[in-house]
Amino acid sequence: MSLITELAQAARKASRKLATLGTDSKNQVLSAMSDALRANQESILAANARDLQAARANSLSEAMLDRLALTPARINAMADGIDTIVSLADPVGQRRELGTRPNGIKVSKLRVPLGVVCMIYEARPNVTADAGALCFKSGNAVILRGGKEALDSSMAIADVLQQVLRLFNLPEALITVVPDPDRALMLELLQQRDDIDLVIPRGGEGLINFVTDNSKIPVIQHFKGVCHLYVDRSADVEKALNLLLNGKTQRTGVCNALEGLLVHKDIAPVWLPIAAQALADKGVKINCDAASAAYFEQATVLAEHQFGEEYLRLEIAIRQVDCLDRAMDHIARFGSHHTEVICTEDLQAAVRFQQGVDAAVVMANASSRFSDGSELGLGAEIGIATTKLHAYGPMGLDALTTEKYLVNGAGQVRA
């Protein structure tokens, strides 16, 4: 039996044990995991230092290095995320009554775990803790296949979580990291449809496409974040500037950072000079259409096909539009169904934008950086789904469960 088959079968067996574990017991384990992460920071940081050293030697991008790096504050944030998950309602076991049929049978639906989730991600060691805890609370076993860049960090975090599982006499296979980053093993993992119920890839376009093209298991894509801010003709100048700077410069290497700016032509002469100075002060590189270039000391004029890039750095694409519909057309063509924002004082424009834009999260007068499970009240998220089945947007506990029908009768038979 191969390593991958062994891991998948062990996870399936472990998931059956977890499915019957009560909420109080799960919360006890999770609280212990949170404490253990804080207590074992030294070993986790040492493993992360090895990953960072190798990543720098391999000239990993600044955005990837930012995602890879752990600090005491980030480890505490992982632990805090688990504490939040403890405080959330357990969806498993929730029952929804559908009524009694004319023949007397009673129909209801019961929320149950998916079973075994496979998480495939790149240089994001925090995903190991977030996904492990979310899957555990929602009753699922999880197989974690992180990128080679974060392997030592992911193994160190998983080791801490598995120590807690052993302490509570639970199988380690509930949270497993694939110990070898060989892509051939990932391909084998994607064939395990008898033992894995769902694959969730988080990473760059190449990884997402590889998983989607090669998986025999259902996939929920967590695709790139080409997020736009549209500054409407009625926008408040200061609000729009704050949304732009927070969305673009607070943290550039994340999927909910702004990559595109659309400005109504009527407000451009007033607002773009202010935005240009603020972006210059932050060192943001400007790419734009010809109509906007005059507002910037240095700018690269883009051809039509060059819009829609995910920069993940201090760089942005800017375009003027003559109406709300043109802004929505641009987003439909170049957006990635992640997060889109309008800044406007016109309620009708906000409603049209939020109803008409096809994205997992559509915001009015709020920063794109709020497109995050913890900020939206879900606790630590397993990712932001950009496909519509079976979840769309930040995925919390409920998205890691499904429903089955329960039918109760008194001996009725079908005529």
What is each model feature region?
Residues 1-107:
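N-terminal Rossmann-like NAD(P)+-binding subdomain of aldehyde/semialdehyde dehydrogenases
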Residues 2, 123-126, 130-138, 160, ...:
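ALDH superfamily catalytic-core signature
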Residues 23-27, 168-175, 252-258, 285-291, ...:
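Flexible, glycine/charged-enriched surface loops at secondary-structure junctions
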Residues 28, 329-414:
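C-terminal core of ALDH-fold dehydrogenases
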Residues 87, 95-234, 238:
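Rossmann-like NAD(P) dinucleotide-binding subdomain of oxidoreductase/dehydrogenase enzymes
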Residues 265-367:
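NAD(P)-dependent aldehyde/semialdehyde dehydrogenase
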